[in-house]
Amino acid sequence: MTKTERYLQLRSMIPEMRRIKRIHFVGIGGAGMGGIAEVLVNEGYVVSGSDIAQNAVTDRLCLLGAKIHIGHGADNVQQADVVVVSTAINPENPEIIAAKELRIPIVRRAEMLAELMRYRHGVAIAGTHGKTTTTSLIASLYGQAGRDPTFVIGGLLNSAGTNARLGTSRYLIAEADESDASFLHLQPMVSVVTNIEADHMDTYGGDFEKLKSTFVDFLHNLPFYGVAVVCIDDAVVREIMPRIGRHMITYGFSDDADVQALNFQQQGHQCRFTVRRKGKEDLDLLLNLPGQHNVLNALAAIAVATEDEIDDSAIIQALAEFQGIGRRFQHLGKFATPKGEVMLVDDYGHHPSEVAATIKAARAGWPDKRLVMAYQPHRYTRTRDLYEDFIEVLSQVDCLLLLEVYSAGEAPIPGADGRALCRSIRLRGQLDPIFIASPDQLAEVLPDVLQEGDLLLTQGAGNIGALSRQLAASELGFSTAATTEVKP
């Protein structure tokens, strides 16, 4: 089949969209927006987009043939048939205003994802934590089984070198975003819920019951013959299960899970465990990821794959050979310092539960190492709403370098900034954190902090990920390096 024939076949899956030729993305540099744009470029659409800065996502889209504008302007949308907008974009953005004046349809990211999913076998992964890893594991499993899925993920799948890919099969595996409740646009065949915690509460008016009900509604978007795969270990998920009127498969470490993990052991970056499934043989598995939280993510993938009759051999191989996701406990190398060798790991987790899971994985895999964390809080509202939880979890490391809050466009909130959080942790009495007012100062502080054998963990959803890579490239700012193993 030629490339043109493949485009025509894929385009025919959504025949009404053949009237649409030019699609413009406002905020195209985000992982979610860029992933959908990449799929559409490869389907043969003329894709353009704008963002305030160039990044790896925009660079990749340029190479694929998309037209990228750095900066927003009314002229960018003049030729568009439809405009896709990120939730981070202000309604007063000149491109949004121009699209309205020109009567160009404006859709949210999740609406476009829903159109891609409409005539495919959709697998949607939702939950407060673990979405990206679970989506990546499912995509890897289906790929290993020869199913060649389309996928859209919120992080870089290392084995593919991208966060999105257009496959040739009917499968679409995608992360479902609850942050703005837009995941309610999706109508998949299989839905996964990893866990439910209080986050993005501004979307839900501060009402946790509303958040829980929204997850129930998400699961009821499944057809009556669809499947809900849910983590029974999560107390809130277990609580809402009686309200779910769809076929359910549960997973977890709990004795009553349909897909259960047993005999968990962690050694360094890898975990071993046995999976028990109803009506199937037990499997002894090696997972090339650290931590019990990642075993839960793997169980979700196993449950989805088993339900779709994917062979056990593909499950075994995909989990053992999984190459990880960018910024999810990503090992960036080992570096020499004047006081000895230090290991550098970078992680995206920015909710207290995510930080706790990362710390637990680090302690389990490297129990003899001193844990030094450089943490950058993400959003003033999250810091305010989960302030006491942050104090508790950040007090669990051996040494804390606390950066100022990454605002993500929010206005500062008194008492919810990095300096206040640092002071509160110090008053707790377990730790004497070091406040880092500017990210540029981190490299200056490290020589006085790091000791031989330390595990340096950079943590957060802001620009600390880029900072961590700068540190790796400069060998933590020291002139001599030990064996450096920077991984993609």
Curated annotation (Swiss-Prot):
Entries under Pfam families matching the protein: Mur_ligase, Mur_ligase_C, Mur_ligase_M
A GO BP annotation: peptidoglycan biosynthetic process
GO molecular function annotation: ATP binding; UDP-N-acetylmuramate-L-alanine ligase activity
Localization in the cell: Cytoplasm
Protein name from the UniProt record: UDP-N-acetylmuramate--L-alanine ligase
Record: residues binding ATP: 127-133
Keyword Membrane: no
Family, as annotated: Belongs to the MurCDEF family.
The keyword Cell wall biogenesis/degradation is annotated on this UniProt entry: yes
Function: Cell wall formation.
Pathway the protein acts in: Cell wall biogenesis; peptidoglycan biosynthesis
UniProtKB keywords: ATP-binding, Cell cycle, Cell division, Cell shape, Cell wall biogenesis/degradation, Cytoplasm, Ligase, Nucleotide-binding, Peptidoglycan synthesis
HAMAP family: MurC
Entry's EC annotation: 6.3.2.8
Primary location: cytoplasm
GO cellular component: cytoplasm
